């Protein structure tokens, strides 16, 4: 059972009722354009979030000194979409930077609690077949139920001794594993992996790999780039294509895999706290992981609500560390190589 959280307005406690308080900011008093520019989401979507998260963000007995769920949601959206605790963001809704930080923490945890509600892999055959049909219609790649990749998000150094979060560029980061469908809906998100881990190691240790290795999704596969090992359930591109069929396979693979690359750019453009433009996330790895997951939940909710997430200008994620390519290891999985060869022979010859 979720435990409701009350955030007290520090400004009200310090200065009394004469100081401007959160509850004086009303959504109905501002324009839709203002809400989009400041918080990145339209009015009705914000109202939906307040209703969805309200039980977590307020106590059963309303206290006059508690920050309203509405204001907590606005504070969190302001941070997610700007990547900053700038004074102007707090001033816009009448709270201090300290209060805003607590609002972000509480909304983040409330969204993380609901991650499984909005980020889920399809289980029924009809939904899986629909995914395959949609991906096939995109570039002619059969059997695909999702595309997988990893993205690094910069975080502050946990401590001087811990090098596990230092990636190949010498920066501290989390390496986040994600799978999306053709619309950019995230079906799997794992945000807790340290930046020193290569993509292939993240996937190998993930719950996603365990599911596919256990045979939960037979006759289906994911598409991954050359930073992953070829598997019976994970098709990767050929390192050096030679035949026309191999070239056609690689072209279809690239066109299909580009969906998740676009999804990453969209995520980081909408949620600027992830793109590194305002610096690394100034939190512990655990809290940073939760913030990333909360943004992914919001991304999926906005897609469910029919929001156009692709039209905003795309800035892209932080510069990603280079990955090793593992095509020279593919021969270790002879069955996976056989499946890919059969795929090329049947569909790309």
Curated annotation (Swiss-Prot):
EC number(s) stated in the UniProt entry for this protein: 3.1.-.-
Enzyme class: hydrolase
Family, as annotated: Belongs to the HARBI1 family.
Provenance organism: Homo sapiens (Human)
Binding site for a divalent metal cation: 149, 199, 225, 261
GO molecular function: metal ion binding; nuclease activity
Free-text tissue specificity from the UniProt record: Detected in brain, eye, nerve tissue, kidney and lung.
Protein name: Putative nuclease HARBI1
Domain DDE Tnp4 residue range list: 148-300
GO CC terms in record: centriolar satellite; cytosol; nucleus; plasma membrane
Oligomer and partners: Interacts with NAIF1.
Subcellular location: Nucleus; Cytoplasm
Function of the molecule: Transposase-derived protein that may have nuclease activity (Potential). Does not have transposase activity.
Source species taxonomy: Eukaryota, Metazoa, Chordata, Craniata, Vertebrata
Keywords: Cytoplasm, Hydrolase, Metal-binding, Nuclease, Nucleus
Required cofactor(s): a divalent metal cation
Gene that produces this protein: HARBI1
